[in-house]
């Protein structure tokens, strides 16, 4: 398998991921179907971690394996994205506290916010039980936090 370059880049503590809107992402009017914003936000969170130096596979296959579940997701849709739009998913990991991480995200077009999301992701053991973040996760994520962290 060939390693591809990490998608996106950091701008301060924010990770920016470019996303193109394809025909498959839209409804019959050419507007992005609402559920696809959730997919874009997920890509932003995953590529944030990858750009910070750790992927989901690294976390699951480490000596202290873990995974994530979304415990809360609040989305505010502001304006529609349309077919062929070049979007940016902005992701900021705010706080790590206990088993939870607060992540704030936005989808933008030409600097204009189209949607915002507040996500609470929880760390779990591979059997689904809640757990605190691993040392590996803390080592990679804490430098990028924009808010206080109980794990520091």
What role is predicted for each listed range?
Residues 104-106, 121:
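Generic short beta-strand
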Residues 2-70, 126-152:
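Hot-dog-fold acyl-thioester-processing enzymes
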Residues 48-95, 116:
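Hydrophobic beta-strand-centered segment that forms part of the acyl-chain substrate-binding groove
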Residues 115-117, 132:
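A structural microfeature
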Residues 78, 106-108:
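Core beta-strand residues in small-molecule sensory/regulatory alpha/beta domains
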